[in-house]
A protein has these predicted regions:
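A beta-strand edge to alpha-helix "cap/lid" segment located at domain peripheries
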Residues: 2-33, 38-119
C-alpha cells in the first residue's frame, strides 16, 4: 500500500524553477546535487542527456529563465512526484514533465522531458 504524502505544489514549483535560474544552471555543484545519478532527459531538440551531459549543457546556458504556466503535480509513489507544466522563452514553448524522487531525505530530479509546443 502506498502511503500518501501531502503534496505541496509551491515546494515542487520552487524545486523545478530553481534549475531555471542562470546562477544555479551555471553552478556545477548545485546542478549535480539536484540531479539524481541515474538522471535522464529527453530534450525538445530530440537529444537524450544523462546527468553529466545535462550538467555540461546547463553550465553554458546564458538564457533567461523561462516563463512557467499550467503547473501541476501528481504523486506517483510515496517518494516520487510527477511535475508537469508549459514553459517558454520568446516564441519557443515546450510542455515539460519531470519526475522528482526523494532519496536519503533529499528530492532529486530523476527524469525530465521537453516536447515542443505551439505558443
Amino acid at each position: 500500500m502506498i502511503r500518501r504524502m501531502p503534496l505541496d505544489a509551491a515546494f515542487f514549483r520552487e524545486l523545478e524553477t530553481h534549475l531555471h535560474r542562470r546562477a544555479v544552471r551555471n553552478s556545477l555543484e548545485e546542478v549535480a546535487e539536484l540531479l539524481a545519478d541515474d538522471f535522464v532527459e529527453f530534450g525538445s531538440s530530440g537529444r537524450v542527456y544523462d546527468k553529466a551531459q545535462a550538467i555540461a549543457a546547463l553550465s553554458t546556458d546564458e538564457g533567461e529563465a523561462p516563463k512557467v504556466h499550467d503547473f501541476a503535480i501528481k504523486a506517483l509513489a510515496s517518494a516520487v512526484v510527477l511535475v508537469t507544466y508549459r514553459s517558454g522563452r520568446g516564441d519557443q514553448f515546450a510542455w515539460r514533465s519531470s519526475i522528482w524522487r526523494r532519496d536519503d531525505g533529499k528530492w532529486r530530479l530523476t527524469f525530465h522531458q521537453a516536447t515542443a509546443a505551439a505558443r
